[in-house]
Regions:
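Aromatic-residue-lined binding/catalytic grooves and analogous aromatic/hydrophobic interfacial grooves
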Residues: 3-26, 39, 46-67, 94
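Short, contiguous alpha-helical
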Residues: 43-76, 124-159
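Short, highly charged C-terminal tails/helix-capping segments
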Residues: 159-167
Length: 167
């Protein structure tokens, strides 16, 4: 059985972003139940030199939408990184899910061999589609997703593995 690039990318991003919305909703509810402004969560960090929750959500969104676009051979939409509230961050994740829904499975046919170029600060990374997805897109996506999860958990939100995985 051949597994499609669409199933390996779109379906994984969609499920995980849906779970991200779930844990963010639990974060907001937890803050309200403890009588503090949920937007405090947006600025939280695990360590002083780490990116805040807001940036973790923005990067999770970016890796999903940009990776799908690169695999499809199209330009990704540009999202301004101007979110400051939990409500705005939830809206961004929803907008990312909406975008993923516009990329048809047919656009990713043959993308395992597509040349992908990723501009970095000091160089351009060049990979074929499948190694790009396996070794760049998914690991980076999950790094930022799990960091967002950990920030909520660290701040007392009652979430666990089932919330993260969606089972």
């Amino acid at each position: 059985m051949k597994i499609s690039m669409y199933a390996l990318s779109h379906d994984v991003f969609k499920k995980s972003l849906t779970q991200l919305l779930h844990i963010m909703d639990k974060g907001v509810a937890n803050a309200k139940s403890r009588n503090f402004d949920p937007n405090v969560l947006a600025g939280t960090r695990l360590a002083p030199d780490m990116l805040a929750f807001t940036k973790q959500i923005q990067l999770t969104s970016d890796f999903a939408k940009n990776s799908m676009a690169r695999l499809a051979g199209i330009d990704p939409p540009k999202f301004e990184d101007n979110e400051t509230t939990m409500e705005e961050l939830v809206a961004r994740v929803k907008k990312t899910l909406e975008y993923l829904g516009t990329v048809p499975a047919s656009a990713l046919e043959g993308s395992e061999d597509r040349d992908i170029k990723i501009p970095l600060r000091d160089r351009t990374l060049e990979l074929k589609g499948l190694p790009f997805l396996q070794n760049w897109a998914l690991p980076n996506f999950f790094f930022h997703y799990v960091t967002a999860y950990n920030l909520l958990r660290h701040n007392g939100v009652d979430i666990g593995k089932r919330d993260f995985l969606g089972s």
